[in-house]
Amino acid sequence: MTEVVPRTVLYCGVCTLPPEYCEFGGAFKRCKAWLEDNDQELFAQLYSVEALTNAVQASSISAEKQEEIDRKLQKQQQKDEAKAERELLKKLASKVVIKRIERSKRKRIISVSGLEVFELDLKKLSKTFSSKFATGASVTKTADGKEEIVIQGDVGDGVEELITQMLKEKGLNQVKVEQIDEKKKKKE
């Protein structure tokens, strides 16, 4: 019996699709530049002048329709790139708020809000907090519909360090992480 050798497939470093499908994604220009840097042969096979003229001749679409399709595709790609840039600016403009809330006597809880913008799984993050700090941690909804992580105990400094480290790993160094003390008003 002959041994079957698995095929190796190259995936784009930008959109994670095979390079043949990059043109259908939102970041075609960046994908094309990545392919040119990483695999010259495949780039020449897909995007050389000969390959493009052969593709146009093989298709039954008229030149005018092809130009219209190209224009629409380019417009869509520009919209997608602008959207990605807006999302990045939104992430950089947002801030993470760590509140230290006094409960009774010497008991405190830490409330972490503003993390939903960064597309983090808050349940996994609360599990990480509870195992790292050996306390209870849960995800709750606030009055305005956003989610926050509530951690039992006074571990605000450790939470701040962990969050800044996680944001640095994602390449978001400019995000503000601030701590706020919220004290209960005494009854008179």
Swiss-Prot record:
GO terms for cellular component: cytoplasm; ribonucleoprotein complex; ribosome. SUPFAM superfamilies: eIF1-like. One of its GO terms (molecular function) is translation initiation factor activity. PROSITE patterns: SUI1 (PS50296). Its main location: cytoplasm. The keyword Membrane does not apply. It is found in: Cytoplasm. NCBIfam families: DRP1. Belongs to the DENR family. The SUI1 domain may be involved in RNA binding. This is Translation machinery-associated protein 22. The lineage of its organism: Eukaryota, Fungi, Dikarya, Ascomycota, Saccharomycotina. The gene is TMA22.
